[in-house]
From Swiss-Prot:
One of its GO terms (cellular component) is cytoplasm. Pfam families: Pept_tRNA_hydro. The active site is at H22 (proton acceptor). This is Peptidyl-tRNA hydrolase. PROSITE patterns: PEPT_TRNA_HYDROL_2. It is found in: Cytoplasm. It is an enzyme of class 3 (hydrolase).
Amino acid sequence: MNGIRLFVGLGNPGAQYEDTRHNAGFWWIDQLCAQTASKTTLEAKFFGLSGRLNGHADTWLLKPTTFMNASGRAVAALARFYKIPAEQILVVHDELDLPPGAARLKKGGGHSGHNGLKDIAAQLGTNDFWRLRLGIGHPGDRSAVVNYVLNAPLRDEMQQIAYAMDDSMLVLPQLLEGKFEEAMLKLHTKTK
């Protein structure tokens, strides 16, 4: 099997961060759990909430509880334990460079200043993992980024982000089967 075996949603733990833009990856995993009747539970050895994707015994879900900037510790722990190579990992995260409502799938590349991605690459020893980038928009000023990602999106932005998450759920079968080109074509055509 060459499809995704580990879906990771990035975010920060705690009620004060629950509704912030930086938690878009957590929202995505929560939606995936709701749609597939899957569950995650706290697993200390994986530094996060983890569980199997319902109906797919070899596919895991993970929400690191290490805080965003140390997400790699959780990802590497689970990936090494279950012998999941980087190319079978999909990390779902907020993306400043995309507007709300956009979702883009890509493999590898830089971290674009996203410290969660930076730590995952460092802990795995490679950038060669898949990313699902959920657009949250940009505040327009670089100095406002930290405050922006740690605040909740406006109602219309949240609606657009929800649409992008819905669209990305439609390519789940392709992701599980390793049909990444097909998934990208379908997703990138759907969310413009």
